[in-house]
């Protein structure tokens, strides 16, 4: 084991699928001697503990109730000396070694353009008069597809309330991180920690969906 990289996986296991096994297996197959932390999110069935490879995997039985966000912070605060962190959901299967992306401070493989409104809109794929088209779409089109807003007004209010715990603010547009799933350097997480971003902890699925947006906001400010 070395402190080059740490894989952090949030897991809620109820026995209905093999996601956590497939996820950890894919990491072990693509990386030499990886260090994997599985943070249990208060799973009703903990029998999976016995079926994970103890050579590479450490399970944190911490009864995490704050979804992926809580799992990420629990693992980072316990293991804060690694160079690179892979923050993953147990539904992810890695198909190849991604260490080439470790040269970046932050990597997200799926992201989406967001706005500080409910709903979204579809933009014609052209560079011609793009700024004017963007302005017109915001002004005239309440329903969108290519740019994603929030699902509910309550999510916006919760997000704005949580951001008050930090120096970050709600912009009009930004890139959100799907999942949120990402690879980042140690100093990226430390900066979030210094700015109290670890104080934003979702307690339900709707709030966790907001974290895709909030992580994106924090990373871009």
Give a label for each model feature.
Residues 1-221:
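ER/Golgi luminal nucleotide-sugar-dependent glycosyltransferases, focusing on the catalytic module
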């Amino acid at each position: 084991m070395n402190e080059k990289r740490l894989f952090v996986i949030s897991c809620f296991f109820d026995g209905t699928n093999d996601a956590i096994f497939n996820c950890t297996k894919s990491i072990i197959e693509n990386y030499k001697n990886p260090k994997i932390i599985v943070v249990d999110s208060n799973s009703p069935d903990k029998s999976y503990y016995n079926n994970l490879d103890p050579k590479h995997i450490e399970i944190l039985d911490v009864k995490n109730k704050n979804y992926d966000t809580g799992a990420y912070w629990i693992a980072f605060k316990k293991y804060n000396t690694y160079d690179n962190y892979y923050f993953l959901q147990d539904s992810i299967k890695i198909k190849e070694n991604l260490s080439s992306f470790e040269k970046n401070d932050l990597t997200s493989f799926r992201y989406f353009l967001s706005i500080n409104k409910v709903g979204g809109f579809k933009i014609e794929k052209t560079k011609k008069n793009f700024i004017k088209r963007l302005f017109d779409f915001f002004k005239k089109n309440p329903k969108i597809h290519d740019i994603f807003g929030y699902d509910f007004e309550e999510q916006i209010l919760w997000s704005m309330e949580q951001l008050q715990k930090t120096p970050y603010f709600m912009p009009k547009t930004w890139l959100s991180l799907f999942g949120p799933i990402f690879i980042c350097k140690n100093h990226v997480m430390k900066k979030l920690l210094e700015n109290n971003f670890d104080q934003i902890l979702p307690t339900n699925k709707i709030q966790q969906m907001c974290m895709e947006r909030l992580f994106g906001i924090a990373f871009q400010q």
